[in-house]
Structures are given as C-alpha cells and as structure tokens.
C-alpha cells in the first residue's frame, strides 16, 4: 500500500525546509495569496535538493484574506490567473534544475472548484493548456477530480488529516465548529483509517467512502513539524509506503 504526503509551502510559516524531509510532494504558493519570488525560489531549491515532487499552489489574487475568501469571477479570469501563476513557478523551477509535476489549487479556489463545474473546468483547462502531463491534486470524490479526469489529466485524490468532513464528502468550512481537529491521537487514527480502509467519519456520524491517494499535512502551528513526523512514522509502522504519486498510481482509482 502506498500514499503520498503533501504540504502547502512558501506561505510564511517558517518550517518549510524541515517539512520537506517528511513529505513527498510540495505545493508551493505562487505569490497571489502568500509568498513571492524569493520564497518560491527557496522552496523549489530545497525540494530539488531533497527529491520532493514540486507542485504549484495557485489561488485567487487575495493576499488580504490569504486566498480563503470565495470570489465569483468569470471563468476566463480564473483561467488566466492560474496560467500566470503556473508560468511563474515553472520558470523558477526550470532555473533551479527542477520542474512542476502537479497542481493543487489553494483555499477558496480549491473549495469552489471542488463543487462548481464552471470553476473546475476553468482551472483544469488552464492546467491542461499549460502542460497536459501535469497531475492535479483535488478533494477526493469532487467535481474537480471528475473534471480533471474528463480532460485526460492524472487526478490525485486528496484527504486531510486534520479537517472535519461533511456527509457529502466536502470539508467543514473553517468558520464552523468541527472544521479543525486538534487531538493528535484522533488525527492519527483518522489518517490511518482513510489510507487503509478508504473511509472517513463525517461530523454527523456517517461513514464517507473515499479514495485516499495523498494526505495533506498542514505546516502552520507551533507543533506542526512534530505532528507531521508522528503521522509519517505511524503510516510507515502500519506498512504503508510513503511515495510521490506517478501518473499510473494517480489514476488507479479512476
């Protein structure tokens, strides 16, 4: 059994270089919600040195709200914005001897693409037109994953170690109780259940089936690094190989 571990980096949390020793995929902020050219270059350089798969983490242009405020934009604007951010990170990756392997939208763009076909198609079209060999990371069972596969992209279904789920498989909004899980033992057990048994218990009590192919480890918070170490150690102790997804692995559940 195999699983990818990913983290969102270049967002000013301070533990990026150390997290790259634990994850197999890095989603690097492209400057629109956090980060900037220097942060992007640092993260890319570290990822290349450590052999971690490089991914772009595009967002709405909304640094004031860390890219977490929902926006209603024309699909053409979303398409152009994603292309712009992919181009920036790709140039830096090329200069550092690496290349982008995947794309994972950030924040509100991620959540809206997960449920809105128009937004999903705009993001997918930008990725496909930029480089159809790129894999797409998205919420398991989401509209975004379906759109990516429909376009012929490798789709990697993502689950979250420390986020609450609703019965429809969507994440509990951060503004609501139960959105974030703070108990480390509960998160460890939940992660193992998602990876080995392909299910998660929703906030309302139902079991939700999902195809976990990559687990997001959040890098912010004072104990994030130590907790990431615990999650990786628990997975390896359970006999799970932690590896970056290839195109064939990505679509094994399609």
UniProtKB/Swiss-Prot annotation:
<dbReference type="GO" id="GO:0017168">
    <property type="term" value="F:5-oxoprolinase (ATP-hydrolyzing) activity"/>
</dbReference>
<comment type="similarity">
    <text>Belongs to the LamB/PxpA family.</text>
</comment>
<keyword id="KW-0547">Nucleotide-binding</keyword>
<comment type="subunit">
    <text>Forms a complex composed of PxpA, PxpB and PxpC.</text>
</comment>
<keyword id="KW-0378">Hydrolase</keyword>
<dbReference type="InterPro" id="IPR011330">
    <property type="entry name" value="Glyco_hydro/deAcase_b/a-brl"/>
</dbReference>
<keyword id="KW-0067">ATP-binding</keyword>
<dbReference type="InterPro" id="IPR005501">
    <property type="entry name" value="LamB/YcsF/PxpA-like"/>
</dbReference>
<dbReference type="GO" id="GO:0005524">
    <property type="term" value="F:ATP binding"/>
</dbReference>
<dbReference type="GO" id="GO:0005975">
    <property type="term" value="P:carbohydrate metabolic process"/>
</dbReference>
<protein>
    <recommendedName>
        <fullName>5-oxoprolinase subunit A</fullName>
        <ecNumber>3.5.2.9</ecNumber>
    </recommendedName>
</protein>
<comment type="function">
    <text>Catalyzes the cleavage of 5-oxoproline to form L-glutamate coupled to the hydrolysis of ATP to ADP and inorganic phosphate.</text>
</comment>
<dbReference type="Pfam" id="PF03746">
    <property type="entry name" value="LamB_YcsF"/>
</dbReference>
